[in-house]
Amino acid sequence: MAQYLAPHELDPYAKGKVKDGKLTAPMFDVVFIQALSTEPIDAKSIPTWKKYLKSEVAEVKAAGSEPVVVVTWAKKDHPEDTKKLADSIISAANENGAAALPVGLAFAEAHAGRPDINFYAPDKRHPSAAGSYLYGAVAYSFLFHRSPEGLKFLGGCDKPLSEADAAYLQSVAWKTVRAFYGW
């Protein structure tokens, strides 16, 4: 993680809080940690991923923040990986005393209910505007422990989502987070 924080040493908001690429004082309430794509289920990558996840979670905690591990989504042409990714990431988050953010589970739920919405960029692994919106709605639900339903923001991309699509994604995000955490 240190390699990612090093450039922030020059940012005004980080003055005195980042040194040698490491957090030295509480700077954020929550820090999201996200693996690369299918790293948590790739046999060759799992040991390295777990090693660095452990150190990143420890570093975030040491800096006074809450680590949250993002449950990533399956690639568009491999929906069967959703459960494998969720199981691997949730298990690793639990092992390290971190919370998990069920974004991938929300992707699967949203796609099942509305296959007409494209959740993926052309590379079939990164999120589209709708996928990014859903991610944000899941994060909102988790962070504020309340529903994003009724929020008027339709996305900041070139073409905003329709009100109906945004309402659907808000609903799925809240339903997923509530079910995941038993709220």
Predicted regions and their residues:
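Extracellular serine-dependent O-acyl
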Residues: 87-118, 137-149
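Second-shell loop/turn segments in exported
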Residues: 37-46, 72-79, 118-127
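Conserved SGNH/GDSL esterase-like catalytic core that processes O-acyl groups on lipids
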Residues: 1-49
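Structural recognition of the beta-strand scaffold that forms the well-ordered cores
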Residues: 1-3, 29-34, 66-71, 99-102
